[in-house]
């Protein structure tokens, strides 16, 4: 379907002004504290992003419909197809919003183009066009079997009120020119055509990396969730320095991390010693109680009323509170492990398959097993920790950590592992953690004994 060849791009890693090789993808996220005028401008930018994104989807959808109805036509009689490349989308929308096309909107004063286009940064429209092109490419590749992962459907229109308000700004830089996205001090971030916005939270790490040429910002993505605006600064960073151990005493033996529903993580070493068990579920359940009350309050209102919108806004805040509670717990667990262990062994769980169990789907999703592994894997290089991923088919829970016998059946209700051969009685999560700590790539996969 694509008819244009994308322009050639430079290959190889980026070299900073200080000679640093920037090849590691990194993102820093901060909460913003914008003024009322900036909040209004943010909302306008998010709306402009929806306009550009929906514009391209509408064009492509109409073109596909017309061409599908012309299947019996000859090649010369067919309606020409549209190019789905990012550059063609950007050029077409620029011409459309500037009033250079016949399809451009007509204003009340008979002028063509979007009358409010001057209020919005150009990169908002460009990034929205790139997002639309990428979404269509994902759908096309999935349909042809050229894209790995789950099946991707045709992109959905970004409806106001349903789509999360978000937009992206590019960091335009040239040699000798100040970057358009930069920190003015420890608590303020300058964004192109928006100005200086107050940032909440510590920014020392990213500012030091920027000053030393160890990080380059590509773009800033602003998103509104639960009534708060956040910014994610995405770019490339220099490779890590040789791993430096922290001053804390590290556990030298391999540590197995068993992720579960009852406990977020149970950690034990290869000698069978329990190091730590992270519960965390109680705090999450407490936060969900407020969420349940907000959901009931929303159910009592009339859809479309002011009370409905107020209750809906309160519900969004509660959802954000639950999400932040879960995120905080996971960061506590992952940070503790990478700072106090030298080798971590985690299991390659099929989380997508586990959530298909409708009785356990919510508990498995709350435990965020995949997210915990992701955090451990990306934080491990910071502290020089080795992460070993055990085979998905290794029966860590069914294997006896005392004699190595493997049970044929072990229900989830059995919280204690009782071995029939050596009479070992041990908590099932602790037993699994010990087995993981002892796992090696040469460990045989035994179904049962």
Model-derived features with residue positions:
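Nucleic-acid substrate recognition interfaces
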Residues: 1-449
């Amino acid at each position: 379907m694509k008819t244009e060849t994308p322009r050639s791009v430079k290959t190889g890693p980026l070299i900073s002004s200080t000679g640093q090789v920037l090849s590691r993808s990194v993102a820093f996220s901060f909460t913003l504290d914008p003024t009322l005028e900036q909040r209004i401008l943010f909302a306008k930018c998010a709306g402009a992003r929806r306009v550009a994104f929906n514009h391209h989807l509408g064009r492509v959808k109409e073109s596909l419909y017309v061409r599908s109805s012309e299947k019996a036509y000859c090649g010369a009689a067919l309606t020409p197809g549209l190019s789905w490349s990012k550059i063609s989308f950007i050029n077409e929308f620029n011409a459309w919003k500037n009033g250079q096309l016949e399809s451009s909107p007509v204003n009340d004063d008979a002028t063509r183009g979007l009358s409010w286009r001057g209020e919005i940064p150009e990169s908002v429209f460009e990034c929205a066009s790139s997002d639309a092109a990428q979404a269509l490419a994902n759908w096309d590749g999935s349909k042809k079997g050229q894209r790995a992962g789950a099946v991707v459907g045709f992109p959905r229109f970004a409806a106001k009120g349903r789509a999360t308000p978000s937009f992206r700004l590019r960091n335009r830089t040239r040699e000798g020119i100040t970057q358009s996205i930069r920190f003015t001090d420890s608590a303020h971030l300058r964004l192109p055509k928006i100005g200086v916005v107050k940032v909440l939270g510590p920014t020392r790490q990213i500012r030091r990396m920027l000053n030393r040429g160890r990080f380059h910002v590509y773009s800033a993505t602003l998103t509104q969730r639960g009534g708060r605006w956040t910014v994610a600064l995405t770019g490339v960073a220099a490779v890590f320095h040789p791993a430096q151990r922290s001053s804390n005493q590290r556990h030298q033996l391999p540590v197995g991390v068993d992720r579960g529903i009852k406990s977020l993580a149970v950690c034990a070493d290869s000698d069978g010693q329990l190091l730590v068990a992270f519960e965390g579920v109680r705090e999450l359940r407490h936060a969900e109680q407020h969420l349940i009350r907000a959901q009931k309050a929303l159910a009592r209102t009339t859809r479309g009323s002011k009370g409905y919108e107020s209750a809906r806004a309160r519900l969004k805040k509660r959802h954000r509170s639950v999400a932040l509670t879960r995120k905080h717990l996971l960061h506590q667990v992952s940070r503790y492990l990478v700072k106090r262990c030298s080798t971590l062994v985690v299991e390659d769980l099929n989380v997508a398959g586990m959530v298909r169990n409708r009785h356990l789907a919510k508990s498995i999703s709350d435990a965020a097993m995949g997210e915990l592994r992701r955090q451990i894997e990306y934080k491990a290089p910071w502290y020089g920790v080795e992460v070993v991923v055990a085979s998905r088919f290794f029966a860590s829970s069914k294997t006896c950590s005392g004699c190595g016998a493997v049970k044929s059946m072990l229900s989830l209700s059995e919280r204690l592992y009782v071995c029939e051969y050596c009479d070992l009685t041990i908590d099932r999560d602790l037993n699994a953690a010990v087995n993981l700590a002892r796992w090696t790539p040469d460990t045989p996969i035994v179904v049962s004994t």
